[in-house]
UniProtKB/Swiss-Prot annotation:
Protein name as catalogued: C1q-related factor
GO annotations of cellular component type: cerebellar climbing fiber to Purkinje cell synapse; climbing fiber; collagen trimer; cytoplasm; presynapse; synaptic cleft
Compartments where located: Secreted
Pro residues compositional bias, start-end: 78-95
Protein's gene: C1QL1
Length: 258
């Protein structure tokens, strides 16, 4: 209702003879009859009419009423990606990774500046000297330990000619070999065993077919502890002694100590 009154108040109704018209103060006009422009000789107007006419050049008062604030609009669509930013600072060091697979073997290296592979004098002086060699003077037969009583070499004194046994004093690895000549002629055979602490570690056999003599021989490499005994035992048949010719022999030596 207030808006209607504000709109109607500025309206001025005037009649100038037969060509009456309606005039709205402000910038709006409602024309019902021809409204010629008035010249200098136009009829006089009332004071109120002139005042209203003079005010027609000023803007009318605002008729707008401010309402409440509207709701926020919808979110717009994402804009295009911006240009890349400057590189950031280096990050912290990460944890160690898992262990990788072993790599391939590298190429062979250059030859060293060392001399030849000859054993040094220090090696000779540090390796224990244990070695023996003995021959069989007297003949044996049946089942008994062969007593090689013709001793030629006995470094370390580990071999006993009276018992025919080698007794270890220095633990280590040893090499032993034996050759026993069979005394045949009666069609029998001979067996000779190398024993360690009474257990057979090597055997050899000689057979008498159409000849009187044959050899039984064998070799071993044994690890010995202190106190171990090694000997040759006749296990049937006849062994030829050979006096001082040493047809039957027993020998051994240390390879390296523990």
């Amino acid at each position: 209702m207030l808006l209607v009154l504000v709109v109607l108040i500025p309206v001025l109704v005037s009649s100038g003879g037969p060509e009456g018209h309606y005039e709205m103060l402000g910038t709006c006009r409602m024309v019902c009859d021809p409204y010629p422009a008035r010249g200098p000789g136009a009829g006089a107007r009332t004071d109120g009419g002139d005042a209203l006419s003079e005010q027609s050049g000023a803007p009318p008062p605002s008729t707008l009423v401010q309402g409440p604030q509207g709701k926020p609009g919808r979110t717009g669509k994402p804009g295009p990606p911006g240009p890349p930013g400057d590189p950031g600072p280096p990050g912290p060091v990460g944890p160690p990774g898992e262990k990788g697979e072993p790599g391939k073997p590298g190429p062979p290296g250059l030859p060293g500046a060392g001399g030849s592979g000859a054993i040094s004098t220090a090696t000779y002086t540090t390796v224990p000297r244990v070695a023996f060699y003995a021959g069989l003077k007297n003949p044996h037969e049946g089942y008994e330990v062969l007593k090689f009583d013709d001793v030629v070499t006995n470094l370390g004194n580990n071999y006993d000619a009276a018992s025919g046994k080698f007794t270890c004093n220095i633990p280590g690895t040893y090499f032993f070999t034996y050759h026993v000549l069979m005394r045949g002629g009666d069609g029998t055979s001979m067996w000779a065993d190398l024993c360690k602490n009474g257990q057979v570690r090597a055997s050899a056999i000689a057979q008498d077919a159409d000849q009187n003599y044959d050899y039984a021989s064998n070799s071993v490499i044994l690890h010995l502890d202190a106190g171990d005994e090694v000997f040759i035992k006749l296990d049937g048949g006849k062994a030829h002694g050979g006096n001082s010719n040493k047809y039957s022999t027993f020998s051994g030596f240390i390879i390296y100590s523990d």
